[in-house]
Amino acid sequence: MYAIIVTGGKQYKVEAGQAIYVEKLDAAAGDKVTFDQVVFVGGDTTKVGTPTVDGATVEGTVEKQGRDRKVVTFKYKAKKGQHTKKGHRQPYTKVTIDTINA
């Protein structure tokens, strides 16, 4: 059985036991989280939400909080000696999916 959930403005296809990286959640490592925005549930029977599936939830456990690799932006003006260098590291949360309730 699998489900498609929405969190952080993105959609993720998840199965029980799978580890996923999502946008940062306000939860510490070891906390339980529940995703209630489930737009699709597949398996023996298929349920499609309009926009979400009624009563469907996905439960998971937060494994860790972290930051992604650095993304560097570099701008420059030719022949002027002007340049700007900036870096950004996006925070993320690693979640292990425990159960899919449909």
Curated annotation (Swiss-Prot):
Pfam families: Ribosomal_L21p. Keywords: Ribonucleoprotein, Ribosomal protein, RNA-binding, rRNA-binding. One of its GO terms (molecular function) is rRNA binding. SUPFAM superfamilies: L21p-like. InterPro entries: bL21-like, bL21-like_sf, Ribosomal_bL21, Ribosomal_bL21_CS. GO terms for cellular component: cytoplasm; ribonucleoprotein complex; ribosome. One of its GO terms (biological process) is translation. This protein binds to 23S rRNA in the presence of protein L20. Part of the 50S ribosomal subunit. Contacts protein L20. NCBIfam families: L21. Belongs to the bacterial ribosomal protein bL21 family. This is Large ribosomal subunit protein bL21. The gene is rplU.
